A protein has these predicted regions:
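Beta-rich, blade/repeat-based domains predominating
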Residues: 17-33, 63-85, 115-138
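Residue position within the beta-strands of beta-propeller blades
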Residues: 37, 88-89
Length: 138
């Protein structure tokens, strides 16, 4: 992670040792900035402070028992709702979106590969606006 000031100068850098970091969300909560970082190779989604301290690690699909083939969980992006709910896009895996509450507790998952309107093929990224969840279909 490289942190720049407004003049474009690097003021800090750190690493979590991820080999395939992919997807980064920056939010402001409780008076501080935090990051949500995905690493699809290790099936990890972590929340960190701006110094790289891990504040939370979300459970994997395998740990939750929600995928028939847990190795197909490859998270690529996150979006955080105004109520703190965390949405994880499984872009390189089974193409589900997994919803957690602000504490990292599983709520539900939806989407997945298929040809019906409710399916998502390659849920690579995700964003939330004030009205609804938006996702890109590939």
């Amino acid at each position: 992670i490289l942190i720049y000031n407004a003049d474009g100068q690097i003021v800090d850098s750190w690493t979590l040792g991820f080999r395939s970091a992919h997807g980064l969300s920056l939010i402001h909560e409780q008076g501080r900035d935090v990051l949500f970082i995905c690493d699809y190779r290790s099936q990890s989604v972590v929340k960190t402070d701006m110094n790289g301290n891990i504040l939370m690690r979300l459970p994997t699909a395998g740990e939750l028992g929600i995928y028939e083939e847990p190795y197909k969980y490859l998270p690529t992006g996150t979006a955080i709702a105004s109520n703190g709910d965390i949405y994880v896009a499984d872009g390189y895996g089974a193409s589900f979106v997994i919803q957690f509450d602000r504490h990292g507790d599983y709520i539900r998952h939806f989407g997945g590969r298929g040809k019906k309107p409710e399916h998502i093929n390659q849920a690579h990224g995700i964003a939330i606006d004030g009205r609804s969840i938006k996702h890109a279909k590939a």
